[in-house]
Amino acid sequence: MFRIGQGYDVHQLVEGRPLILGGVDIPHDKGLLGHSDADALLHAITDALLGAAALGDIGRHFPDTAAEFKGADSRALLREAAARVRAAGWRPVNVDSTLIAQRPKLAPHIDAMRANIAADLGLDVGAVNVKGKTNEKLGYLGRCEAIEAQAVCLLAQA
C-alpha cells in the first residue's frame, strides 16, 4: 500500500535572520521569520510526510507556542517526524519539492539541500528532488517579501 502527502509553508523575509532552506545556510541580506529556524522547505516536507501517514501536521507535533521549539533546527524536526511516520508503519519512498523565491538564486544550493533531506530521511539522493522557481516578480513573493515551499511525498507500508 502507498500513500501520498502534500505540504506547504511560507515565511516572511526579514532583516537580521539567517536564511536556511533545506538545512543549508544561504548567504542573503534577509532571512525567514519564524519560531524555529523557519526553514520553509523542510517544514513543507515535514507536513507532507505527516499528512501522508495521517498524523496531522507540523504544528500539532512541534507547536510554535512551545518554548522547546524556539530556534529549533528544522532538520531535527524532519528526522523526528520521519521517526514518527516509521513508528506508524510507513517508510518514505521519495520527495518532490518546489521553492518559490524571487531572490536569492537557489540553484547553487539545490544539491546540498537534496543531500541533507536524503540523509535525514534515510533515502538515496536520487529519491529527493528540489526545484527553485521565481514568481516572475508578481505578488508578495515577487516583491521579495517571503519564500514559499511546496512538497509532495510518497510513503510505502513498512
UniProtKB/Swiss-Prot annotation:
Keyword terms: Isoprene biosynthesis, Lyase, Metal-binding
Pathway field: Isoprenoid biosynthesis; isopentenyl diphosphate biosynthesis via DXP pathway; isopentenyl diphosphate from 1-deoxy-D-xylulose 5-phosphate: step 4/6
Enzyme Commission no: 4.6.1.12
UniProt cofactor(s): a divalent metal cation
Keyword Lyase: yes
Cited InterPro entries: MECDP_synthase (IPR003526), MECDP_synthase_CS (IPR020555), MECDP_synthase_sf (IPR036571)
Site residues by UniProt (Transition state stabilizer): 35, 134
SUPFAM superfamilies, sorted: IpsF-like (SSF69765)
Superkingdom field: Bacteria
Residues forming coiled coils: none
Cofactor-binding details, from the entry: Binds 1 divalent metal cation per subunit.
PROSITE patterns in the cross-refs: ISPF
Residues that hold 4-CDP-2-C-methyl-D-erythritol 2-phosphate according to the record: 9-11, 35-36, 57-59, 143
Pfam families: YgbB
Family, as annotated: Belongs to the IspF family.
Function (record text): Involved in the biosynthesis of isopentenyl diphosphate (IPP) and dimethylallyl diphosphate (DMAPP), two major building blocks of isoprenoid compounds. Catalyzes the conversion of 4-diphosphocytidyl-2-C-methyl-D-erythritol 2-phosphate (CDP-ME2P) to 2-C-methyl-D-erythritol 2,4-cyclodiphosphate (ME-CPP) with a corresponding release of cytidine 5-monophosphate (CMP).
Assembly and oligomerization: Homotrimer.
PANTHER family cross-referenced by the UniProt entry: 2-C-METHYL-D-ERYTHRITOL 2,4-CYCLODIPHOSPHATE SYNTHASE, CHLOROPLASTIC (PTHR43181:SF1)
Name listed for the protein in its UniProt record: 2-C-methyl-D-erythritol 2,4-cyclodiphosphate synthase
Taxonomy of the source species: Bacteria, Pseudomonadati, Pseudomonadota, Betaproteobacteria, Neisseriales
